[in-house]
Amino acid sequence: MEISSSIPQKYFTVLTEEAPNIDEIKVMLKSIGEIIPDTISNKNIISNITTDKKGNMFKGEWNLKVNNLNINIKLFKGKTSSIDYMLFDDNSKFEHGNASNALVILESTKTSDSSSRNTAVNQRIVKFTTYDTMYPESNAIKVMFWCDSIWNDKLTDTAIMGFRLMDTLDINMYSQHNGNIINMKEKYNILPFSSCDEIIKFKNSIKQKKGNISIRLSIIENIINISIKLDKGYGKDFGRISHDPNVGFLSAILNAFEKLTINPKKYIIKNHNIEQKYFDSNPKSKFWFSINEIDIEFEGCIIKDRPEIPERYFTLETEMTEKLATILYDQVLSYETIFSNHGGCALTYIKGHNDIILSVGQKMPRPDIVFRNDERKEIEIIEGKLERELSKGIKQLSDTHLKGFIGLLKQLYPDYTIKKGLCITISSIDCINKYSDIEFPVKFALDNEGYFILP
């Protein structure tokens, strides 16, 4: 899109932990009064690629130019429970990993109330409370964004509780479906809580789901008792703070209580199922980072020390990683992407023809990218790996490992041939020929300098 020289140019930087997506960028810019037209899509996000005598070289970042808006996009790695996206003005410096001057912070998910009440709302709040704890003086606009998710006309009580806590903590809520941005606070007439008593009454009024251990709250004078299970109750996570939805909820209500009360409160956590040896190890935890200096006691346990808050919120991604390789391959290939899982970026379904989708189970093994070539009637499953982990990537492409996922693909595309390949990050693209005879072909290679090839 042409940039008019008569309009003053504006420059921004977006930092993201995920593959850059236009919907999140639009919502962040809209939050500060800058509108990106509906006609702008992910195709307008251009990889920063240069060419020399050696070949094409990716600079590890992207650019988006819309009218007078110039947006530079970079990947970052969080040092704690970091938000998914951050928007900064052009004067920001990133070498110290300080996010206090962010204009907007945004957490994104595709999970909705109908698919998972707790992970869609409560689990996400800890990202915001952690940021607020680290940067209490920040003026960043906080945005929770449900991207490409479907919400019913009537919310569950659990979702209403989570929405009201978000509103109490000044978190803006938006969803997007079929290109439309929806203000969730307005759609569902969400109101913030006005007192600690109101939070307690509302939470205790929610009926217990059969088979679940409900969270219950009570207050006696200046002490608030919170009965909440904080471990997963099995395996390596038994006795450890590991129940992410409940951790998010606990962080949310503690911070909401603190905001609404005039007099300092003491909080006693009961029925938590956390063992003393967990606290003795003083583990770094997003929970501790999100409730710094709040007076909290775990019944039956002694907390001798709390982990210190990290000095840095993030570091910029400076190396060519598996995630960068799969994101770049996804962007330079012209085929339709029907599934992507770039380094854990959330995508919970496979796209079929005519807007048909099939959900991928949370524990189902999955590849990094799946492409569709309608001309050849082919589906291409891609696994991204670092050079030293190629053998692992080959195993993960096996029919045995991907049995459930391939079954979903065959349901959606019974007439298509399924092929497999690797997307690798290697020391130098000059060495690519040594992988010509492995079980699955190398479809894309990115080296440590940023040079890439489509073999």
Q: What residue spans do the PLM features occupy?
A:
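Hydrophobic beta-strand segments of well-ordered beta-sheets in folded domains
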Residues: 6-14, 38, 102-105, 136-148, ...
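Anionic, Ser/Thr-rich low-complexity intrinsically disordered regions
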Residues: 11, 18-33, 88, 142
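Active-site metal-binding core of divalent-cation-utilizing nuclease and nuclease-like domains
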Residues: 43-99, 334-377
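Domain-level recognition of nuclease-like catalytic cores that cleave nucleotide substrates
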Residues: 144-262, 413-455
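Low-complexity, serine/threonine/proline-enriched polar segments
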Residues: 12-14, 32-66, 171, 177-210
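Nuclease catalytic cores
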Residues: 9-25, 276-348
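Catalytic cores of nucleic-acid endonucleases
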Residues: 111-158, 364-366, 372-445
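Extended, basic/helix-rich recognition subdomains
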Residues: 226-314, 372
